[in-house]
């Protein structure tokens, strides 16, 4: 067991631990789940990171990480889009729109070869839309596996109110809190442990629990 796991055991907390920057919950959250649907084989995501079942993704307490009025941006593939709408609703969000990322490279596919990926926008409460002139598609280059376009963060910041949180993040971004297996996480989610938590979160948790 590593240092962080000794300080915060996500299997033994009953509500999310959030930093001061997310007091009241996130105003906008990006979620990029490691779907296990059509991700086997030599070129599938199974070769890059641990995958999650639909049941595990549904169980994520995304709604409780967000403010009363918030946006959720959920990444889906063509194969998982139908489940994405269902999961948004389970998390407490109403699906509102789809943003499509066009990739200038021929991808994989069972029937047709994929050149797109999508991010579903859902809302709860009365979260405002900050601008009304954002198109619902963009053409961005493909980078390493599962590296999403940096432009997406700019779009979210332009459209949605903060503060901002990303789940399954793979790299930190200024002004955003993040959680995932590949980074130092700024939050802790009950039942979903990750390898490393930020020093700030650990200290806050120790103060609340009287830990050393």
Predicted regions and their residues:
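Class I S-adenosyl-L-methionine-dependent methyltransferase catalytic core
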Residues: 1-212
